[in-house]
Amino acid sequence: MKNPLVAKAALIGALVLGLMIPVGMIRGLVAERQARSNEAIAGIAEGWGKRQSVASPYLVIPYERQWTVIKRETIDGKLRETRTELRELQVLRLPASSVSWTVDTALSEKARGIYKARLYSAHITASGMIDVPARASSEDGTSRYRWYNPKLVVGISDPLGIRAARAVRLGGKEYAFRPGPDDANATAGLHAVMEGVAFMNREALPFSFTLELAGSEALSLAPLGADTTVAMRADWPHPSFQGRFLPAKHDIGKSGFTADWRVSRFAAQGAKNETIAVSFIEPVGLYQMLERASKYGFLFIGLTAAAFMLLEILRRLAIHPIQYALVGLALAMFFLLLTALSEHLGFGAAYALATSACVALISAYLVRSSRAVALFFGCGLTALYAVLYALLQSEDYSLLGGSLLLFALLAAVMLGTRRVDWYGITAPASR
């Protein structure tokens, strides 16, 4: 090109794009570290308890149905009658008609190396009623029934986390829980065999039991078609209410939260995937913030290069492309330092140290050319890093804040260069 400024601008633009390669590599490193963190957390959960889902209890009554088939036929002019006794084994499942849950959850952390998993211990109390229909009798006119010992089944997704299961009280008597659901409709959980329960002449059976359950990340309850009320309390200030049903009311404070749910049987419909769920999450996770911060790499390097170009034009300084490259690499190193330090110190402290190191390095590199330039860039980069930190901390307003920042920077450039004679600067050099 005939104009050296245009040629240099093109070179600097290519340099900025080239510096996206190390920034992209750092983003890949963040994803790799996040995957390793997830593996460590999953390993801790394997030994403590995974995400837990507890289903409403239901009564399982095995029975034998007996009936007689009478076959009449005429043989040699005589009517003969043959009676055949038939029997089959079946299961009657009676879901709870109403369940009240009380859940008190305490959270803790366990570490594996530098990675930490958020775990919980839940004290769960359940009480309710199971309706026994009229057909649960010994005869119905055409068939005879032999009823075996019923059992109460409670589905629990990860039985490893069951720390204690006190005896269930059903119909005024107590029965011990046994491992496993012992029912084809549940894959994991507990059951209690009700030996000698006289359910034939009862319209409803009251029940109650208590569980001590350990898990990680989230806790959910499945109503399974029952009228359900839930009162939950936990010492975690950042709950995420998930599942099919949101709480009717909740109160969230610095020391934790309380929440209450009311779900009717008409809303629940008995589906296992329709749950009341709470996830114990960070509002903005560490690796999520690191990944979001690395997305601003192009903005940081591009704005710094543009500031250098403007300074070169307005102050008539000579800044070599190598200097652009070195400053750009220092800016890229910020994200690597941030990733490495945050795993040990936390995001806030790591951000402050990485910012201080990079601003000090770039300012020291520029101070020999001009103290004023070094001070200007040091203050400008510090302000830029401060704005970025605010954007990262405010997930809901990050787009709005970023848009306003770019608009303010564009306005500053436009107003600051109103008197610049761009034709004179970019005119081809005379021979």
Q: What do the predicted segments below correspond to?
A:
Residues 272-301, 320:
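Cytosolic-side membrane-insertion boundary helix
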Residues 50-54, 135, 396, 422:
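Intrinsically disordered or highly flexible coil/loop and linker segments, enriched in small
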Residues 35, 39, 46, 56, ...:
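Soluble non-transmembrane domains of integral membrane proteins
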Residues 63-72:
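Membrane-proximal extracellular/periplasmic loop immediately following the first transmembrane helix
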Residues 26-51:
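Alpha-helical transmembrane signal-anchor/signal-peptide segments
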Residues 2-28, 32:
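Hydrophobic alpha-helical transmembrane signal-anchor segments
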Residues 1, 32, 36, 278-286, ...:
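Juxtamembrane loop-helix boundary motifs flanking transmembrane segments in multi-pass membrane proteins
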Residues 298-431:
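Generic detector of multi-pass transmembrane helix bundles and their immediately adjacent loops
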